Design a protein with these regions (language model features):
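Hydrophobic adenine-recognition pocket in adenosine-nucleotide-binding enzymes
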Residues: 10, 83-85, 121
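Alpha-helical elements of Rossmann-like donor-binding domains used by nucleotide-donor carbohydrate transfer enzymes
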Residues: 17-21, 43, 101
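A short beta-loop-alpha structural element at the N-terminal edge
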Residues: 4-20
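A conserved beta-strand-loop-helix scaffold within acyl/acetyltransferase catalytic domains
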Residues: 22-87
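Short beta->alpha linker loops
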Residues: 13, 39, 119-120
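Terminal substrate-recognition subdomain of acyl/acetyltransferases
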Residues: 1-3, 107-112, 116-215
Length: 215
């Protein structure tokens, strides 16, 4: 990432970038030929004022990138939405830095919520995987009607509805905060019951990880 770029939680002064952000979201989706749930400058400004957005700017105040938080089903599900980077700053690591920052902000604000995303971008999928997201079926996402209504402005909305919201062009990914804790508890239970099988399991996993790193 370029040293003169600042990635931080957005504040009320950043609402001046709202129209630039939404215009770039729309033009980027059009250039890729993919769909996107469109957001208005007012909506983006609201997220900024609520402290639920991360922005990247240069030291001179030039807008570089953006992402915001949405919560559904009374905070049971949280999405990091609208990730966008200005064309001149793409492939510089900015998107990854923004995603990591918005992910941590989401975990701080909603520590017990499931984080999910719908995306057609391979780069976003890769970053999500690094953060602990896993591909899931649409049935594992929120059933909040307001969330799905946001897809109406997407060019692929007819495809989504023709499949009863069970599938579309986007890949669904989910991060469950308690997943790692549950895995650790399960290993502990096996250990207390039978040390030998657990030792074999650890050795087997170790060999697998060693093989995986060589790939």
């Amino acid at each position: 990432m370029e040293p003169n770029i600042i990635v931080r939680i957005a504040d009320s002064g950043d609402t001046v970038y709202a129209e630039t952000i939404t215009n770039e979201m729309a033009s980027s989706a059009q250039a890729r030929g993919t769909g996107i749930a469109r957001r208005s400058p007012d909506y983006v400004s609201q997220k900024i004022q609520e402290g639920k957005a991360v922005i990247a700017v240069t030291a001179t105040g030039e807008w570089v990138g953006f992402c915001y938080i949405e919560a559904w089903q009374h905070g049971q599900f949280v999405a990091n939405s609208g990730l966008i980077v200005a064309p001149a700053y793409r492939k510089t690591g900015i998107a990854k830095k923004i995603k990591h920052t918005i992910f941590q902000l989401s975990r701080d604000k909603y520590p017990n919520s499931k984080l999910f995303g719908l995306t057609t971008g391979l780069a976003v999928m890769k970053i999500n995987s690094e953060l602990g997201y896993e591909p899931v079926t649409y049935s594992e996402l929120t059933d909040d009607e307001e969330f799905w209504a946001g897809c109406k402005s997407c060019v692929n909305y007819d495809i989504l509805m023709s499949k009863d919201r069970k599938n579309c062009m986007c890949t669904a990914m989910l991060y469950e905060p308690k997943q790692e804790t549950n895995k650790q508890e399960s290993v502990g239970e096996v250990s207390s019951k039978n040390e030998a099988p657990n030792l074999f399991m650890k050795m087997d996993i170790s060999k697998f990880l060693s093989w995986f790193r060589k790939k």
